Amino acid sequence: STSKYSEYVTRSWKHLVPVPSRMANLDRIAQLLCAYDVVGLQEVDAGSLRSGFVNQVKYLADNAGFNYVFDQSNRKIGMISQHGNALLSRIQPAAITEYKLPGLIPGRGVLEVRFGAGANALHVLILHMALGRRGRLRQFEFLAELVREYGYVIVMGDLNCGSDSPEMKALLAAARLRDPSPGLFTFPSWQPDRQLDHILVSSSI
C-alpha cells in the first residue's frame, strides 16, 4: 500500500508486476467487504501478470462470501494488465448492462446493475471517471442522460473530483442526484484531505 506521495514514483513498478503484499491487502479488503450486501469496485484486475494471475474480483467474492459477481475489464493489455470495474452482490441482479464512457483515451466504462423491475427498480452504476476535467464533463453528461428517467439510482465510484467542483454540481443537477456524505475525504489513503470517491443517490433514496 502507498503511505506517501513519493511512493507513487518509487513504487510505481508494483502496478506492473505481482508483489507478495498484494494478497495480504486483498485479504484485508475481503474482511471489510463482509459487512456489505452490494459492493462496487474500480481498478481491480481480472487475472493478469500485475496481479500474479489472480482474478482479484473472484478472490474477493470467494473470501467475502458474495454469490453474484460480474467484472467489466475496460483496459486489457494482453497478459500484462486486465483491470476495470466490478460488482459483488448478495442479492441477485435482474439485469447487468455495460457501457463504454466517451473520451479521447479509451478504457473507461460504466457497469449498470438493475435490481427489481418497473418503476420501483433500483439502478446501481459503478464507474471510474477521467482524470481531466474536459473528459469528466463529457462522461458526466453521458451518465446524466443514462439515469435521468430512473426513479431510484445509486452511483458509486472514483469520480476524480470533489462535491464542490463545477462538473459535480452540474451532474447532480442534471441527473437529479445528491451527495449524502459531502466532505467525506477519501484521498490520499494515508491522510485523506480530498473527496474523489463518491456514492451518489437519487432524491428518492
Regions found by a protein language model. Name each.
Residues 28-51, 113, 123-127, 143-170, ...:
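Active-site beta-strand/loop signature of hydrolases that rely on acidic residues for catalysis
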Residues 1-63, 76-78:
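N-terminal, active-site-proximal structural segment of metallo-dependent hydrolase catalytic domains
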Residues 1-15, 97, 112, 121-130:
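Active-site-proximal beta-strand elements of phosphoester/diester hydrolases
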Residues 83, 89-94, 106-126:
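Beta-strand-turn-beta hairpins that frame and shape the catalytic cleft
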Residues 48-53, 67-89, 106, 160-205:
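Active site of divalent-metal-dependent phosphoester/diester hydrolases
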Residues 53-58, 138-144:
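Charged helix-capping and loop-helix junction motifs
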Residues 1, 43-44, 72-75, 91, ...:
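Active-site-proximal beta-strand/loop segments in catalytic clefts of secreted hydrolases
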Residues 49-54, 100, 135-137:
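Short, solvent-exposed loop/turn segments at secondary-structure boundaries
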